[in-house]
A protein has these predicted regions:
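Hydrophobic/aromatic-rich alpha-helical bundle segments in the mid-to-C-terminal region
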Residues: 136-141, 151-205
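N-terminal hydrophobic signal/anchor transmembrane helix of membrane proteins
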Residues: 98-103, 107, 198-208
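Alpha-helical DNA-contacting segments of helix-turn-helix folds
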Residues: 78-85
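Amphipathic alpha-helical segments used for helix-helix packing
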Residues: 82, 113-144
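Short alpha-helical scaffolding segments that buttress acidic/His motifs in well-ordered protein cores
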Residues: 108, 123-130, 167-175
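Short hydrophobic/aromatic patch on the recognition helix
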Residues: 60-71
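Hydrophobic alpha-helical connector segments
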Residues: 90-123
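Basic, helix-initiating cap at the start of DNA-binding domains
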Residues: 1-58, 72-76
């Protein structure tokens, strides 16, 4: 073997060096955030019982053992993944309550930016939790705390919490028909009529 051949065999691969140099450094905070983001998507796309920590870790590009290290297991990871999943406060602070029915109905009909990008889906969490003994009560409590109670505070007046729950019922039903079931009756041709009809019912709840 010539010295030239030895050099060729032992010379480092420049592409490998480039990959190492350009690979972003990953600290504990970044790893934790990646796991949490992957979990939010997984739990909204499949039932809790069907989601494994290995699946989440693979989506996040980390070792499965890190899920337990940072979150203490799947149950605690799920609880953290649904924090702020249904939060209404930031979206409606200062909103014109005389147009609330129209605004929120239009938002539900059009879908959120996250849904359009096929990322986290709060509706998916709600629907899947309804058939899951492991998560039903926790998701219900989270939805009540993050959506129903803050909305009731916006509504004020008599039976505000009941009215907020009725509004939530309208919205969940509408979102299920439109986005989960893809009903052709709620397609583009009839969307405006649907918004007008449902928003009127919601506005009646707002006005008390």
């Amino acid at each position: 073997m010539t010295s030239r051949q030895k050099v060729q065999r032992t010379a480092p691969d420049p592409s490998a060096a480039l990959n190492v140099a350009t690979r972003p450094a990953r600290n504990a905070g970044d790893t934790r955030a990646r796991i949490l983001a992957a979990a939010r998507v997984r739990f909204s796309l499949d039932a809790y019982e069907n989601v494994g920590t290995r699946d989440i870790a693979a989506d996040a590009g980390v070792d499965a053992a890190l899920v337990n290290r940072y979150f203490g297991g799947k149950e605690k990871l799920f609880d953290e993944a649904i924090v702020d999943a249904f939060a209404i406060k930031d979206n409606f602070d200062g909103v014109d309550m005389s147009r609330f029915g129209e605004i929120i109905t239009t938002l539900v009909m059009e879908g959120s930016e996250e849904r359009r990008e096929a990322k986290f889906d709060a509706l998916g969490i709600l629907l899947r939790a309804s058939g899951s003994p492991a998560t039903q009560e926790r998701v219900s409590a989270r939805f009540h705390a993050e959506f129903v109670l803050p909305l009731a505070r916006l509504l004020r007046g008599r039976d505000a919490e009941l009215r907020a729950a009725l509004i939530a019922s309208y919205l969940i039903g509408l979102a299920t028909m439109k986005h989960a079931l893809g009903s052709p009756l709620l397609g583009c041709a009839t969307q405006r009529k649907a918004v007008v009809t449902v928003s009127a019912a919601i506005q009646a709840c707002v006005n008390g």
